[in-house]
Amino acid sequence: MRKFTVTVLDTTGIQPYIFGSNRLRENIGASYLVSQATDNWARNALGMLKDQIHQEVYAFDPEKHQPDAKPHIEDDELAAELVYAGGGNTVLLFSDKQYAVQFTQILSKRILEEAQGINLVAVHKEFDWDNQSLYQVVQDLMKNDLDAKKRSRIPSAPLLGLSVTATCRSTQLVAVGMSEKFEDDEPYLISREIQKKLDAVHFANRQLREKLLNTTSEIYNFPLITDYMGRSEGDSSYVAVIHADGNGMGKRFQEFGKDKSNRDYIIAMRELSHSVNQAGINALKTVIEILVQSIQTDENGKKKVKGYFEIKDNYLPFRPLVYGGDDVTFVCDGRLGLELAAIYLEELEKQPIADADGKPKPIRACAGICVVKTHYPFARAYELSEDLCRNAKRFVKDENKRDFSALDWHLAASGLSGSISEIREREYRVKIPDFQEVASLEMRPISLRKEQDSDWRTWKGFTKVVQHFNEDDNWKGRRNKVIALREVLRQGIDATQKFLKNYQIKDEQLPLFPEFSGQSTDLAKKGWLNGICGYFDAIEAMDFYISLRE
């Protein structure tokens, strides 16, 4: 009988830790530290454990992609083995529970010293390798012990100044120094937490370049401040915060190792974790390639994205903050948010990974895009992008149990007040005589592509209408007419038809959606279908959509 201890690691309070600041450099450093805490630092902690106990350990390296590499802990050769790090968790095996506790102490100490603000949660459980399922033990730990420990954890109360002290501008904790001057940002008071985040920015940037840039794109840099995200001088400038998350990936991780032997479970989880991580990286690489290909040099030697706006000092108007795996957050120029989110979802679908039955299956995902003014509070924008992503996921679940990629967005031309549901109830719900129920001005969320004949709320349909408004002779350069149409749509079908007739719009119809169930022309002539307006979203997005692939 071979007994081992399973350890599962997780972190809590990550969102406020990463996104609580309105300074991009602090967000960048925070994201890097979180990724290190339960991955590379866990491997390093195993190395330190080895030195303390003078026994061999094995820290599986996914970069080498050898999921069955020896030595194995069940062969009595190891004191500890890293099973996998992925899906938000890190799982390890120890030959003795004391080693598991010792390892956790080593890792916890480093996090306290180098990443104050990250809360590590660890649970341990002994199990019999020969008679128990490792898969089941890990599932029980995650569903029961880990959740219970998170709920019962007493939130830490940081010790504030005991005398006359200055406070950090970002965290309101006791300041320990001043930040270094960076670009136009003057030095400011910082706490130790912010100090560590800023110290990590260089390493975060280097890692991002190594993972995502190739020989074509390596001349470009990732921006460290939002003002370098493509901001146009003299214009109102916007930044887009995009959060994307795979559909049902938690369940996919749960089911993947089911009904396998313990060693086969370890191999399977390593393969799945590696393939999901690589899928996300590959999708982001393609996003960058398409963005780089869209940058053109004009007659004055200025580099512009599709001729629309200039990029400064070779800074790409795009920056991933959380990446690797199916859970991704990136920021970009506000005019690129919708397009880059759609490209990312499309490219992610092209990266099939093995399913529980061993057959390749594409990753479907949803994305939420929140476009706000450049210096709008970042934490709030991220929170809304998460809400929008959840909205898109609910849309997928409501559609007859089909699995597809979808996206939802909000374009905040001014401020934001309330949740997404409150904003839409207040600004996008109208009572018009054509429908008994309250009608919806927005067609969002939309599916990435047409899945069946009746689908019309699709990315292709939406972008076709936006481009028509921007380029067709009936509408191009006639912004007042478009704005007038937007207000008329609020009044319903009859008012819309009168508008089309009075303005002598060709065929007395709005831009056609791709044909669906024979209703495309009907929608174009009325502007509404089944209580949903097909054109309000497109009009709103005219200044926030640039096609990069045409």
Task: Report the location of each language-model feature.
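Regulatory and interdomain segments flanking nucleotide-handling catalytic cores
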Residues: 1-550
